[in-house]
């Protein structure tokens, strides 16, 4: 269990917090690339301005967490419960991985351009209309 700790501008790349209980922990301005938070209970924590590329939150419970200006490209949220967490100012949430079991917060806590609907069948995807074929 970790409660009330502050990690400010710390490089925690590839660390493991799997199966841990984190309460009111600040991970602000940190490099959390490839950190393992699988099955963790993460309550009232902040990830403001942190890099979370490839960070694994699979099957975790994040409740009342703040991801303002956090870079979530490649983050994994499969089977995660993200109820009440705030992703509204997060970056690259469209580049994360999730599945039909992921529980997202209400739309007011998500970026306007984010689609939380999981599509396991990609056959319905189409190219954008303004696509132009190159001569090369």
What are these regions (language model features)?
Residues 1-136:
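Tandem repeat scaffolds
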């Amino acid at each position: 269990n970790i409660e009330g700790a502050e990690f400010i501008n710390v490089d925690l790349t590839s660390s493991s917090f799997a199966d841990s209980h984190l309460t009111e922990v600040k991970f602000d301005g940190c490099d959390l690339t490839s950190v393992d938070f699988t099955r963790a209970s993460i309550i009232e924590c902040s990830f403001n301005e942190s890099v979370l590329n490839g960070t694994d939150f699979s099957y975790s419970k994040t409740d009342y967490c703040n991801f303002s200006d956090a870079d979530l490209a490649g983050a994994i949220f499969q089977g995660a419960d993200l109820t009440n967490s705030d992703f509204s100012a997060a970056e690259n949430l469209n580049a994360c991985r999730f599945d039909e079991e992921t529980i997202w917060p209400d739309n007011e806590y998500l970026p306007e351009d984010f689609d939380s609907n999981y599509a396991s069948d990609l056959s319905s995807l189409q190219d954008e209309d303004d696509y132009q074929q190159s001569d090369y």
